Amino acid sequence: MKRFITVCAISAAMTAGTAFAETVKVGYMTTLSGGAGIIGKQMQNAVNLAMEHKGGKLGGMDAEIIFADDQRKPDVAKQLANRLMKSDRVDVVAGVIWSNLLMAIHKPVTRNGTLLISSNAGPSPIAGTQCNKNFVSMSWQNDQTPEGMGKHMQDAGIKSVYLMAPNYQAGKDMLAGFKRYYKGTIKGEVYTKLGQSDFQAELSALRAAGAQATMIFQPGGMGINFVKQWKQAGMDSVSKLYTVFSVDGVSLPALKDAAIGILGTQTWSPDLDNAINKKFVGDYKAKFGAYPSFYAAQAYDTILAIDHAIAKSGSKDTAKMRSILAAGNIPTTRGNLKMNTNQ
């Protein structure tokens, strides 16, 4: 059996095997360094687990996975995407946590005729008229999940809310989605620095605002720091905290009991009752000693989607894989997915 390669930085790597065997190459871009590396490592773990489950093959073809560390920098992401396509000649570019990075690589990859599959980022500008037929999302459009939170808080009769998110594309999308369904009073709408770790000034302003509830989007380490500082400041007595993509499998090991009582909306849960999810969660816990996050689940699903597309089409051709994915019925941890079109 041909082995598959995991590389933590961009590098050329060839698998050992038969001289004329066809190999599918996937460039998987995520953040593996810095504070955001906690998210990227879960995604890398999930990709490796999926490849183990598939015996190192995708759709029956020998497979090579090349991991690229984007360092959470758009310019680095663009350079890596070009290298993956031009030097490594990958068949698929996948992954991407951050919406500003996906915005940076979207046009170069799709216009090259390469299939681009997002495991997480879903910036609203690339839906609708800016959508490209070579782009597929295995997650969401950013505004969708906070729309659910907005509807919940509206239905719950919450009269006023304070909003907070990082100042980048996803943060703006999240709050826009929330406001689409929440019609109460917005006491404040604050955009923090991406990667910010100290929220004392924001908490002071929030306390003074007197909002009945607070809704935040602060993924990864930002959410860990925010919730810890919220608790230390005794903010539970001031405002009820609601979150999207802020309290999850990435942050729970650090937050522990501090997360109790915080409500969030999400499209995946480790206790979803289907065979694929049970195997994924069970094997992930056994191998890595912790529950997976939704980031990990979506990374795992991305590999399942590529496997499905190649198996059903019998090809790694972009148009043929794209056609299979558009038809839906993709087996994932969330059940069999259907695909809509935003083109």
Language-model regions, residue ranges each:
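Extracytosolic ligand-binding ectodomains
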Residues: 2-10, 21-343
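N-terminal signal peptide c-region/cleavage motif recognized by signal peptidases
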Residues: 16-18
